[in-house]
Amino acid sequence: MIPKLIVGLGNPEPKYDQTRHNIGFAVVDALAITWQCSWYDHKRFQGWFGEGLMAGQKTCLLKPRTYMNRSGQAVRAVVDWYKLDPQSVLVVYDDMDLPLGRLRLRQTGSAGGHNGMKSLISHLGTQDFPRLRLGIGKSDGSKDTIAHVLGKFSPSELPIVEKSLDLATEAIAHSLHHGIAKTMSLFNNRDVCP
């Protein structure tokens, strides 16, 4: 299936900008720039929303303002308004179980302990929707998990993050032309790990 709604997960306050947990926001921001898609604060959708023609089809972008743990509310509002099949919703988010620079695209799956994904699965009533996980790596032990996830990338990590964003936007663009299954086979073996 071809994605019609691309959701980046993150937290809305400026203090969360450029944190590991907001890498989903960073990906859809990069898509908006590439596709010259403007954001506007959409009250009904509880998030920043943009739409345009990408790959010859209407495609929507969403960054929920509901905070990570309630992301499903915003996504559900868009799905209901546009009468979308959950399988046409591609969710982009961070995964600390993947090393920095690695991405994994899947057509379905569990929340894997990610609270944003738990909210989406609960509000959509299914886990059968595609997701693109971007590796943020685990803490080196000097800080706890929450501090790691909500922390900013180090200067030495930023070049890898930029390459990850490029690879993620390339994978999403490919999925709009060729679907999730073909994109998985091409991009799941590629990464920008050091």
UniProtKB/Swiss-Prot annotation:
Q: Where is this site: Discriminates between blocked and unblocked aminoacyl-tRNA?
A: N11
User: What is a single Pfam family found in this protein's UniProt entry?
Assistant: Pept_tRNA_hydro
The record, for InterPro entries, names: Pept_tRNA_hydro, Pept_tRNA_hydro_CS, Pept_tRNA_hydro_sf
Query: Transmembrane region positions?
Result: none
**Statement: the UniProt record of this protein carries the keyword Acyltransferase:** no
The residues responsible for catalysis, as annotated, are H21 (proton acceptor)
Protein's GO biological process: protein quality control for misfolded or incompletely synthesized proteins; rescue of stalled ribosome
Q: What is this protein called?
A: Peptidyl-tRNA hydrolase
* Organism from which the protein derives: Synechocystis sp. (strain ATCC 27184 / PCC 6803 / Kazusa)
Specify the taxonomic lineage: Bacteria, Bacillati, Cyanobacteriota, Cyanophyceae, Synechococcales
